[in-house]
Amino acid sequence: MRKGYKAKNRWSAGFLLLLLVAVWLTAMPRQVWAADRLPDVKQMEEGIVSWKSSSEGEKELLTGELRDQAGSAGSDWFAFDVARMGSATEEQRAAYLARLQDAVEAVYANKEDSMMRLRISDIHRMALTVIACGGDPENFGTDPDGNPINLIHDTVWNSNSCWGDPGDQGINGYIWALLTIDAKNYQEPEGAEWTREKLISELLSRQLADGGFGLIKTDPSDVDLTSMVLTALAPYRGQDKTYTYTGIISGQEETSTVDAVAEKAFARLSELQADDGSMLTYDERTSESTAWAMIALASWG
């Protein structure tokens, strides 16, 4: 198992399920849910929020150590979750944004150190948290020269920024870049180095022979990455548009639609499912993999 990829050392099973619930509920129209199931889901949300808060020794959301560690994966994803669920008050979200802005400004004030310890997807996470909490990632604090910090421009549109090309992190960079710009349907600026079409093409080009996706072409299909790719591609389902790219397996020019690639990817996910319905990653059942598969399914309706 790849230590650099699996996130078990950061996210507990309950925390991952919280992320699942938050994204799932906001991704799907409420009318498609059976009315008698909504109270169960809401109760689940509240239980997980209560567990996380109590485990941190806090009685209120986004306070204490959780807020003090704004800019870290654990705190940011929790803030993202409770903001998307509507559990955090406006005051709590504003307080978290203020602390997160301090963290972002510190990142830009120490770029050399930040580039060594952070990946571009970490900045995407911060941008998504800003959006969820009601902030503006295109104008979030100032850099040491007094210029507004534009997290969207610096991590997606402009590959000449200090964070470089989204692909420098491999497939993860493309996934989170696309998720970030679609979180609020950001418009591509004229002359953007990376466009939606380019990001989508890069993702499609990385489909493995069995239909799934992995970190590199020699890796087996990974449930988490396959599900993450499907989630990122979900806004483009049902379109006739074709994309042309060089497949990493064939080395040849290929043309496909998002739906055609997704059909193969979902088929591979089905093959990686255990008899009890959970998902297997490297022959191991994990809540993270199961949660990501459910998010992908929910995103595609």
Q: Could you tell me what each predicted segment is?
A:
Residues 145, 149-150, 196-200, 262:
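Core helices of alpha-solenoid repeat scaffolds
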Residues 1-9:
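N-terminal secretory signal peptides that target proteins for export/translocation
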Residues 150-166:
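A conserved helix-loop-strand patch within extracytoplasmic ligand-binding domains
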Residues 35-70, 89:
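N-terminal module-boundary/linker segments of secreted carbohydrate-active enzymes
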Residues 15-27:
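Bacterial N-terminal signal peptides
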Residues 25-38:
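Sec-dependent signal peptide cleavage junction
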Residues 60-91, 113-139, 163-196, 208-264, ...:
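An alpha-helical repeat/solenoid feature that recognizes helix-turn-helix modules
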